[in-house]
Amino acid sequence: MRARKATVELQYNGAAVKTSLKEFGEAFSYTDPAGGSSDSISLTVGDPRYQWISAWLPHKGDQITAKISFADRDGDDKTTTLDCGLFTLDDLSYSDNGGKAAFKMSGVSAPALDAFSTTERTQNWEKVTLKKVAQTIASRYKLQLVFDATDVAISTQEQSSATDSSFLNQLCNDYGLMLKVFRSKIVIFDREKYKKKDPVATIPREEMSSFSWNTTLAGSYTGGTITYTDPKTKKDVTYTTGGGKRLLKSSTKADNLADAKRKIEAAVTSANHGITTISFQTMGRPDLCAGQTIMVTGVGRLSGKFYIDKKTDSLTSTSYTSKIEASQVPTTSDAVIVDAIQRLAAIGVINSPGYWIGKHKSVKYLDDLLLQMATTILVNHDTGLYTGNPQEALDALVKYGVINTRDYWAANMGKLQYISDLICKAANALPEIIQ
């Protein structure tokens, strides 16, 4: 759905606000992050009769319930309502420039009880699970817990002079889970699981009024190493996942090897999220929300599947727009693999793209190999160092982080004609400095 107009419905401390953006409002925005922070709203209202600094003066801690009603742009008069939730005012400001007075209110979707985010606690959690910890904390503030992830057993975990909000958020981060507080709920979910879901919509470039894209290697990793002290033997234990030169190093508490393995894999995955990002603005999209995936098309090689990290709906008396901030999701869908093959052909790593388009499903993991090659190899340096030498070519690809499973490809190059040639050409494309 693409909305052509929208109106805001507000309840202030339980009472309906009998105003509209057209009468008083200048702007309203609703920000929906996927996790790591709470939903938020911002409302700017004109104050020509100075009511907002007298009888209507809001106070920090007051509560606002916000809903946005949308009319479909197709003109069928169908109305959809988006319940933004309950917000606690935490920031108020007022300005008066030459008689043009305005009052701005901002609020977050967090428990009204300040203790959740301000009161520090010290507690030793023993023989619990992450879900049990979250349920205990949620109950303190009369919040509902929504837990959509594989639970984690925790032998001991110290909460040392930390607020319940920061402690629970850090605990989720340690295990690669996302936390979000909204609509009187604490929601914990597995972002990697959500990234695997089917796209809910396709957004072509023609529907975007603006578009930006960024990618970087800074902060990305091909693996990680964790060192922890075994609680039973008191000896240091080191575990490494992945390979290559860009290893994330961690020294942290772990209950056992399985716990350490999950923590370092979560840390690497979290660090690699957001390596490639996009941001675009479109006509209001009430059907989209953070945590969903979308397909973006019409931007050449930048097209693909993306996970919505944040969505901001902005309304004025005359317009409604949505800003989407999203991270690319590596995928092996046909469209993305065809695009990867064409990119490799464009730089001379592949000579016959039609062959690979027809064969990319014939060998297990070939999709992933082609996608990783296209993502990593952007320029063909054509060193010629590995022509006719696929085994050394595999070593070079491992060093550069193009592949992690050398043994698999060493054993399976003969399953399809020209795989060894592809591996050699890909290695030749790497800059000589890393050889």
What do the predicted segments below correspond to?
Residues 100-116, 318-335:
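Short solvent-exposed strand/turn elements
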